[in-house]
Amino acid sequence: MKLLRWCKANAMPVIAVLAAAVTAVFVPPDAAYLGYYDVKTLSCLLCVLAGVGALRRVGLFPLLAQRLVQVFHTTRGAVTALVGITLVGSMLLTNDTALLTFLPLSWFVLERTGQTKWTALTFILQNCAANLGGMLTPFGNPQNLYLFNHYNIPNGEFLSIMLPPFLLSTALILLCCLFLPREGLTVPRQETLPDKRRTAVYGVLFCVAVAMVLRGIPYWLGLLVIVMALLVLDRRALLGVDWGLLVTFAAFFTFSGNMARIEPVRELFRKLLTHGAMPVASLTSQVISNVPAAILLSRFTDDYRGLLVGVNIGGAGTLVASLASLITFREYTKHVKGQTGRFMVLFSAISFGFLGVLLVAMTLWMR
């Protein structure tokens, strides 16, 4: 029973490891396995998560968010601010970390102001903001970090590729926020202040992580500095890293590497990708999630522009299209009981609506 509960709580890494194990039956482990793993991507992801975790532990993000929300005095204004914070946060913190940080804050605000009836819509819009807002930066989404390093995409080109879908996504999110009422409310205040010295040090460590991602410093140097610093200053920040996400990445590297060596699979994806990387990436993401889709399809195409856009807009749609969406679902069911069906209907309507608009618009844009 305990094992079953643990597997349910860690569904994605468990599924990823099982998928890798199944492919290992067809491609037995050999020396080629060592070439599957992108150590730079794993190192950068670890350092970003650790840096953000340290800042989160000193209470910086909830304080900044609450101060911003206090500027607004209506349901529409407060929720729009919370969604906006999540969108901006996802560009800097990664989408899953932004959701883990700001979804609890949204529940806190909605509950204390008697507006819990808007929890589903607020959480869903925050989910869209995290998944689609994070597309603008190389470290905003895990799949971005992988593709950015795998194809060695220049910083300026990455921004030029992702800016159009980002702007359209932002406009769609803000449009949805207009459906919220302009009821007056009082937002609760938090007076607890983070330790300024520790916050400054952790801020520097986070900047080191960003410099790693943007190739400003060698990744091994950044990894050494951040890990050694946190071992001394805050070991819990390291222990609190989402190790399941790192295991998931490593397992999917194995899965995609093996799949690329199975000839019928290679032939299938070669044929599919003749129809364009973007639609194939978007649709593949709906079934196996956008992170493994990015890793798998990168083995078969050099069209990194289409693949990058495809796996990012492919984060909208089904609940499994993005790993971060499972965080939103888990947070909602933790706070709101007996309304899972209503949540899924609203989630599907909004998420598939976003996917449809973005897919059509970007197909026309990239012709």
Predicted regions and their residues:
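Hydrophobic transmembrane alpha-helices that form the pore/transport pathway of multi-pass ion
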Residues: 82-132, 295-308, 337-339, 363-367
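C-terminal transmembrane helix pair
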Residues: 159-170, 174, 279-367
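Flexible interhelical linker loops that connect adjacent transmembrane helices
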Residues: 2, 66, 179-203, 235-239
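Membrane-core helix-loop-helix motifs of multi-pass transport proteins
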Residues: 114-182, 188-191, 328-358
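Transmembrane helical segments that form the transport core of multi-pass membrane transport proteins
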Residues: 36, 58, 62-67, 205-302
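Membrane-interfacial loop-to-helix junctions in multi-pass transporters
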Residues: 39-41, 70-83, 112-123, 197-200, ...
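Structural signal for alpha-helical transmembrane segments and their membrane-water exit/capping regions
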Residues: 2-32, 42-59, 178-182, 208-236, ...
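Interfacial loop-to-helix junctions that mark the boundaries of transmembrane helices
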Residues: 3-9, 31-41, 153-165, 191-197, ...
